[in-house]
Amino acid sequence: MPSQLEALRRHTVVVADTGDFEAMRALRPTDATTNPSLILKAVQQEAYRPLLVQTARAHQGASPAEITDRLLVAFGRQILDIVPGRVSTEVDARLSFDTRATVERARGLIALYQAAGVPRERVLIKIASTWEGIQAARVLQAEGIRCNLTLLFCLPQAAACADAGVQLISPFVGRIYDWHKKNAGAEWVEDARRGANDPGVQSVSRIYRYYKRFGIETEIMGASFRNVDQILALAGCDLLTISPELLTRLAQTEGEVPAALSPQAGHDDADAVRLDGGEVAFRTQLNEDAMASEKLSEGIRLFVADARKLDALIESHGAA
């Protein structure tokens, strides 16, 4: 009998959500995703500290922002030596509400990759799914720079991304689950909210059906998982990005994994209506969704905090 990881691969592209090279070698994902928190975690480990030191010292006098981008690309290059597919590299979250600055920073990241001999087709630029971020992605996609819109918590965000023609979206599962569990308090019944009944799973499934219903080509990559049940309930999603801990658990557990999602599911939603992708509708609908608006803001704040910590590490190694 196959492992659950092997069985999952029959339905879904498996992506590693980590900056840990050794974990990638062991688990053999197709793609990999990184974010400021994962890179910060990696460079605090002895195995990866030399990459920070070498990058910082090689560019003494450059700004922390420039060193950070060079460090992200250094990680990305090594990741692409391990995975056969793509790596996602994130634009500084402090630019989440600045379309022009996001575009410029993304162009710079792609230029660094291309200077290192990495074709742009192997890189996804991660951008927060704010209105400004989505408009930046629209510009970048038109230039052939492929984007991964992250911190996505609701269908209106996904619809706006589709209208912008982005390559891929990363709707979050675990953070939606966290919000609903916290807000339910004593009324939360864990067993009743597992698998297909998990609010995070339901959100991604809704987005998946919407995309398939309207023939939207943007890829959907479920992200932010808290447990294996959430992963298995989304088998069949285009891609799933999973932590090494949960990938290992899947690899160590035998069992078949049936597809929970299929393209046909979207055609069953015959009454679905295509959402208005305009700015007013986007901001109104996001504001009315307490969970999505709160988790988007919180996610940006967390990434900004880790970006500042990374700046401090860079400065401590003489880069500023």
From Swiss-Prot:
Keywords: Cytoplasm, Pentose shunt, Schiff base, Transferase. It catalyses: D-sedoheptulose 7-phosphate + D-glyceraldehyde 3-phosphate = D-erythrose 4-phosphate + beta-D-fructose 6-phosphate. It is an enzyme of class 2 (transferase). Its EC number is 2.2.1.2. It is found in: Cytoplasm. The active site is at 126 (schiff-base intermediate with substrate). NCBIfam families: talAB (TIGR00874). This is Transaldolase. It comes from Bordetella pertussis (strain Tohama I / ATCC BAA-589 / NCTC 13251). The gene is tal.
